[in-house]
Amino acid sequence: MTQTTTHSTTPDTKTGTAEPETMRPAAPAKAVKPKTSAMIASIAEPGQRTTAAPFGHALAALAEQDTRVVGLSADLAKYTDMHIFAAAHPHRFFQMGMAEALMLGAAAGMAETGLVPFASTYSVFATRRAYDFLCLDIAEPNLNVNVVGALPGLTTGYGPSHQATEDLAILRGMPNLTIVDPCDSVDIEQAVPQLAAHDGPTYLRLLRGKVPTVLDEYDYRFQLGKAAELRTGRDVSFISTGLMTMRALAAAKRLEADGIDVAVTHVPTIKPLDHAAIARAAEGGRLVVTLENHTIVGGLADAVASSLIFESQLGSLPQLRRIGLPDEFLLAGALPTLHDRYGLSTDAVVTAVQEWLA
């Protein structure tokens, strides 16, 4: 790298002539950090209201009321918002290192003694790497261990090593396990105490960092095991979960301007599924569209289709379409670009519905 120097002169007090000062290296220019879709990237739209670390603050607040609550992390406390809990309750936080299986085994032991553990890591590590421990140490004895998986679906641009696009498909078949996919900060804050009070293991698909705040504008309260109709509509019925509920609501408003009346039913609990709410959302001869931040294989779309076929009393099945990630490993890149590419953006949802109704 070429190094530049500066030159200046000062008068010589003896001769009156100007002599060069000692040459000094120029101060190096400050490096400009490139903008990346790092693991801490936010899913919030520009200008959208957000709440910082809702999970960490909700867990810390719960621990003030319930001395049984403990937190564990597999060396990712900062990136799962568990650092908020650790700072508030340092003697009830356990840093387990990069050992997800060990973390879940330890959490199971804590639950056996009557504690209520929340164990956090990335979703890919909780589901792919530690599945056997979750199954046999936690789910089989039906222990109240709450597994918190950050970066669910396409919420990071780091590629297949960190994108948990199939976590629901992996876990839906596990007996005793309750699965929650929250939409926003409101969902997360209200879900935490209900997960702690639940009799049995849970898996929370965590949105972390600056999480959008959306559901406070609706007459909504999180209820474990229940879905909620957020908006009525006669033409199209959206059945959505996770962050795709905020996209569903935004798309519904856009479609309304085109004269398309869209209902939105939010399904925060994937398992057990609220079959009655699913059946109601499919009534009226409307186009039914499922929306999920997950592969279209083994997630909400499959759960809804199965519910309508085997659990509902509908005389005829509705026309059903699905919006979700493709059955493939995804690219790395900036989140807005990836959401457009794979059909999760509001623009993509609006376009898909318009084409289906054409």
What are the roles of these predicted feature ranges?
Residues T2-R205, K210-V211, ...:
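Thiamine diphosphate
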